[in-house]
Amino acid sequence: MSDVERTEFKLPEGMDLSSPPQRNQDVDAAEQQGEHDIERSLRPKSLDEFIGQPKVREQLSLVLNGAKNRGVTPDHVLLSGPPGLGKTTMAMIIAQELGSSLRMTSGPALERAGDLAAMLSNLMEGDVLFIDEIHRIARPAEEMLYMAMEDFRIDVIVGKGPGATSIPLEIPPFTLVGATTRAGMLTGPLRDRFGFTAQMEYYDTEDLTRVISRAARILEVDIDQDAAVEIGSRSRGTPRIANRLLRRVRDYAEVNGDGHIDVAAAQAALRVFDVDERGLDRLDRAVLGALIKGHGGGPVGVNTLAIAVGEEPSTVEEVCEPYLVRAGMISRTGRGRVATAAAWQHLGLEAPEGAIGGTLF
């Protein structure tokens, strides 16, 4: 280890190095069906079942099968991309494909090195450790993770004061799967320790339609193909949103009809839930309205927009803006946010001369 110093920490209270690690209950991706378990029941269980992301699936299959053929644990895996594209599902599939147990945590939960040590000490050989939002891991825990990822060991300090002793703790070989929505916030030393990195991309309407059709079969929902396309086209390129909209349309169809979903039922349901033909919801339209009607199309700072719509700046910046920028409705400039011609047109207004061009996808 050349780029970081050796990390030492105090042994967490209750950790006994003399006792073998006890296996926790495995994470099971298939649980009983119930309204609160629907999201889990819709998760694919293998790379073959996973819809979309063909390049990632091909590359990951090579990594996993190569490791299995050699009888070793695969390299650590970093999955990056916007929320809702299947990073957690992919981690579950990796464990399933390897026949291993999956241990799950998140970056914000690892505030101290001892938090990570407690989890690492319970790993069994071949386990998959999934850290969601890994870019938010605390620095002391991150530095310990360097040694664990490279050398499968960490150093612990037993005792206090002058009598404290540093003891190396060997960790069984494991595979770390990290997920992040902000790959740029990862430090170089952490990023470099992942042997395989993959960027999850937004879905097109065709793949989202397949996602919806698969979910409808699992949920035993009677839906026309055209209705599935209609829902998919409003799902913002995100499978999680597609599945959520399907469930809301199902509710509408069951309450107001016989449960069958055709295009008319899908359109009516999505109107009730304030999702327009391009997938924009109430907050998205409020942001566009504040930008165009309140400030003549901009440029406007994000703080001003947030005040206008009654939300936190982080909500506008992280929830609304990514899709509005992708949809060609907002342009981010050095002076602030500017509405494009497509945004004016979407609100039924005539774009002023000189408005930035933008096309809906």
Curated annotation (Swiss-Prot):
Primary localization: cytoplasm
Residues involved in ATP binding: L42, R43, G84, K87, T88, T89, E150, D151, F152, R193, Y203, R240
Domain notes: Has 3 domains, the large (RuvB-L) and small ATPase (RuvB-S) domains and the C-terminal head (RuvB-H) domain. The head domain binds DNA, while the ATPase domains jointly bind ATP, ADP or are empty depending on the state of the subunit in the translocation cycle. During a single DNA translocation step the structure of each domain remains the same, but their relative positions change.
Highest taxon above the source species: Bacteria
Homology family: Belongs to the RuvB family.
Region (Small ATPAse domain (RuvB-S)): 204-274
Alphabetic keyword roster: ATP-binding, Cytoplasm, DNA damage, DNA recombination, DNA repair, DNA-binding, Hydrolase, Nucleotide-binding
CDD domains: AAA
Protein name per the record: Holliday junction branch migration complex subunit RuvB
Binding residues for DNA: R332, R337
EC number: 3.6.4.-
PANTHER family referenced in this protein's UniProt entry, alphabetically: HOLLIDAY JUNCTION BRANCH MIGRATION COMPLEX SUBUNIT RUVB, PTHR42848
Ranges where the record places region Large ATPase domain (RuvB-L): 2-203
Organism per entry: Corynebacterium aurimucosum (strain ATCC 700975 / DSM 44827 / CIP 107346 / CN-1) (Corynebacterium nigricans)
